[in-house]
């Protein structure tokens, strides 16, 4: 039973293809089949745990191409294109709408300029398709450059780290931005 809960989710729901649903799914407690319905389950559970607790919602961050360092076959494109007909930004909008409806504080990381897609990594190191020589591509230049997890080097060397270290997960610098926003709200509670 905590005094403050933070709810920071959405990117895995989007990538996994969970249907966004509609705000009516949230209002009518529509169940776990949609993102909106699932969010209602979470909010209701937190309120049952402690009706007096403060709840802070956090939207997902934007993301560029993710590549897992321990298994490069685990990789995914960024939020710059649809996944199963949905954009990650729609999930951020849903969280903002829920926060407004419930009068909850929302940390909108998706629309935080310091966490924009151009600032997530300095570059992605890939083979130039014409020459086969590795080259550092800044966003959005790397979007259509192929990456082969079987033969290519890891595309995010230490020097490429910016707000994320792998295109998705926050680096120390990225967590600093998130922490600043969270502390600002916590001080006002």
Summary of predicted features, one role per range:
Residues 1-189:
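Alpha-helical cap/lid subdomain in secreted, periplasmic
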């Amino acid at each position: 039973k905590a005094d403050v809960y933070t709810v920071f989710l959405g990117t895995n729901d989007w990538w996994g293809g969970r249907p966004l649903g509609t705000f009516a799914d949230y209002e009518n407690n529509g169940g776990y089949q949609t993102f909106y319905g699932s969010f209602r389950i979470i909010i209701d559970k937190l309120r049952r745990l402690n009706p007096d607790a403060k709840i802070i919602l956090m939207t997902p961050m934007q993301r560029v191409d993710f590549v897992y360092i321990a298994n490069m076959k685990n990789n995914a494109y960024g939020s710059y294109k649809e996944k199963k007909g949905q954009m990650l930004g729609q999930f951020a909008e849903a969280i903002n709408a829920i926060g407004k409806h419930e009068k909850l504080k929302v940390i909108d990381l998706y629309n935080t300029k310091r966490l924009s897609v151009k600032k997530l990594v300095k570059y992605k190191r890939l083979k130039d398709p014409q020459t086969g020589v590795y080259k550092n591509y800044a966003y959005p230049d790397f979007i259509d450059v192929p990456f082969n997890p079987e033969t290519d080097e890891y595309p995010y060397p230490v020097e490429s780290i910016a707000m994320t270290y792998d295109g998705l997960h926050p680096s120390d610098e990225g967590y600093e931005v998130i922490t600043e926003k969270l502390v600002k709200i916590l001080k006002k509670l």
